[in-house]
């Protein structure tokens, strides 16, 4: 393809439209309140805030690319954070700073990721082997994970972390917020996984046409298991970021992030019927939503009104994608009957 052809292809892509939307929202909010929105404090605050729900959106993205969904991501995030928090408070102690005690921090992170992988394995098994609809399977499992977190903490927050934990969520490395660095690494890793590996091709094939993937000798059950395990580990990573940001862990943190994660994935161009999705689109959608959320916060819009706006926006984006963009974009390929 020529350079001119590549430029034309990009300008017609969903990612280009998202870039325009992100820039438009940024400019609008800047004009609305330039002194507050463009202040260094606000821009830094946004860079610290959005990785929490952005990582959950990555988890939602890979499951939606298979035509499924993972409604348990917030429950997995909180359960993982609670387990890590209990390890840090019961075993490491608040005096941890350097030396051998850092081993407990690594152990807590590893334990949280294992919880996420185990939760993903449960979700993947329910979908792949028991044939449950992903929306129902993960809705039920999410309640179970939240219940486990409540049982482990009695419904109260776990606090008293070592200073290193707060540093991860609230400090910068070479001038870049640590949570933003973590999100960037995870987004890059997921992008490479979906675009540069055979596994990513299988995910796209299965999402576009499960029957064709089966005929192509794709091990569908293995693909689904891996997808939900990856989603679970991404959710655990988000839980660790939330824990370090709040310097505490609780079973009901981030309850508003579920709808936001779904909205970001759909706004980012991920086909909810499966078969298409790009991480760059999700990243641009994250930026758009963060700019909008920050603007609503400056306008002192209540959380309840904000939830209403997210819901209306989700429905609007779905309608636009299914009609204006064309039925073929969001229509799952249907196998034709042989004569």
Residue ranges and their predicted role:
Residues 1-57, 92-107, 335-338:
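Membrane-interfacial amphipathic/re-entrant helices at transmembrane-helix boundaries
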Residues 1-27, 215, 219-222, 292-339:
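Cytosolic-side transmembrane-helix boundaries in multi-pass membrane proteins
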Residues 26-31, 39-94, 125-132, 266-276, ...:
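Single transmembrane alpha-helix segments in multi-pass membrane proteins
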Residues 35-45, 92, 150, 156, ...:
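Inter-helical junctions in multi-pass inner-membrane proteins, predominant
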Residues 92-142, 284-285:
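Alpha-helical transmembrane segments within multi-pass membrane transporters and channels
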Residues 104-112, 118-123, 175-249:
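Helix-loop-helix "hairpin" substructures at the membrane interface of multi-pass membrane proteins
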Residues 130, 134-196, 223-226, 245-254, ...:
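Transmembrane helix-bundle core of multi-pass membrane transporters
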Residues 235, 246-311:
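Transmembrane alpha-helical segments in multi-pass inner-membrane proteins
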